[in-house]
Amino acid sequence: MSSNPEDLKLLTLAKATMARSNSKSAAALRDNTGRTYVAIPVKSGDFEVDSLIAVLVVAKASSINGIEAIVVCGQEPAPSSVSVIKSEDSGAKLYLVSEADELISL
């Protein structure tokens, strides 16, 4: 669990995004410069990505070169999505929000 105020801000962003979009999950990412990005799952026909991959795509579109942390709330991301993040930046902190609003390391 993290008590880092910056990670708790990501929790707030992810929860607000999930609530605002009425989505089953949302993710918030902080890059190594402190910029933040949010995303929800995307589905269009046969194409589907969870919120973890969606937030990575949004961040990569802004040319990030490192990830500090990602917080996912709602539906747990697929193991393959977690692997993508770990291979993108092995030092990235990755958390899932528990029902008690605690950050659990993935």
Where are the predicted features?
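C-terminal binding/interaction regions
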Residues: S2-S23, V57, S62-L106
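Residue-level detector of alpha-helical recognition elements and their boundaries
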Residues: L29, E48-V49, I70
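Hydrophobic "anchor" residues
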Residues: R35-T36, L103
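Short beta-strand scaffold segments in enzyme catalytic cores
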Residues: S25-R35
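A short, polar/charged loop-to-alpha-helix boundary motif
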Residues: G45-K60
